[in-house]
Amino acid sequence: FGGPLGTRRVFSNRGANGIDGVIATAIGVATEHSGPVGVVIGDVATLHDSSSLAALARRGLDLRILVVDNDGGGIFHHLPQKTVVDPRSFELLYGTPHGTDFAMLATAHGLTARVARSRDDVQVGAGTTGPHVTVVKTDRERDVAAHRDMHKAVADALRDGR
């Protein structure tokens, strides 16, 4: 999913809630693109557009999907309601854990899939001719801490003129 920026075209999708139709959009891009297409997508967005996996399997496009699976709505852990809603209610209303096995879901739709357990596994998935799904499992609380550390490092660098 990487490479020199000059060799990559970037597309984005903005559904009604920001997560609608991301896979369908990627299928459209892959239909008109002569090379491989990669999409990085969250687990909840994948659930919202999972029927597109069946459409993808029927088309045989070289679309490589990386699902970041933190078992729910991780974005909400970065927003103010995380600190004002009691933890049990927060998890029910915002965390929305689903317990979905995305590799199994992709396989059920006729796609090849793998769960990445290392960076090398992610690289193998990214290099697998599609349609292919690679799932990376993450932890929401650790993600928040990592984002906080990155934001601090950037703020410190900007403040110090680095």
Predicted feature locations:
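Thiamine diphosphate
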Residues: 2-162
